[in-house]
Regions:
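Short coil/turn linker and secondary-structure boundary residues
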Residues: 17-20, 81, 117
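Catalytic binding pocket for nucleotide-activated donors in carbohydrate/polymer assembly enzymes
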Residues: 3-4, 38-111
Length: 130
């Protein structure tokens, strides 16, 4: 078993115990490993690599079900079923390899409305000129 000393594994309780929230750190990351959490959809706005842990995909499908008909279509990143998949994902990140940029853009277009000029649109709405 490899020891990945430069990777920090955090759970919500680790953050909560220290009065912190995940979203305070997300912009500092180079990539995100997630399960089926909606944080992955939010992370699309950063356009950085995503990896999805799917080792319990079948069990999750049977026990909870999905919002989308084809949930894997909405997971635009490395699908990791075992430690080797995880290690490959980390190596790709280390080597600057991004295999899912186009897929992320496609899912981002489906899940996020207009993603530019937010401030200008607010100013326009309130008839504020700068």
């Amino acid at each position: 078993e490899n020891v990945l000393t430069n990777i920090v594994y955090l759970e919500n309780r680790d953050l909560a115990d220290n009065g912190l929230q995940l979203y305070e750190f997300i912009n500092c990351s180079d990539a995100l490993v997630s399960d089926y959490s909606s944080v992955a959809i939010d992370y699309l706005l950063l356009d950085r690599p995503l990896g999805f842990t799917l080792d319990d995909y079948e069990a999750y499908t049977e026990s909870r079900g999905w919002v989308f008909d084809d949930p894997l279509e909405y997971m635009p990143g490395e699908h990791m079923y075992n430690m080797q998949d995880f290690e490959n994902f980390i190596l790709d990140i280390k080597n600057g390899k991004d295999n899912y940029k186009e897929q992320r853009a496609s899912v981002r277009a489906k899940t996020h409305n207009v993603c530019d000029n937010y401030c200008q649109r607010v100013l326009d709405y309130f008839n504020i000129t700068m």
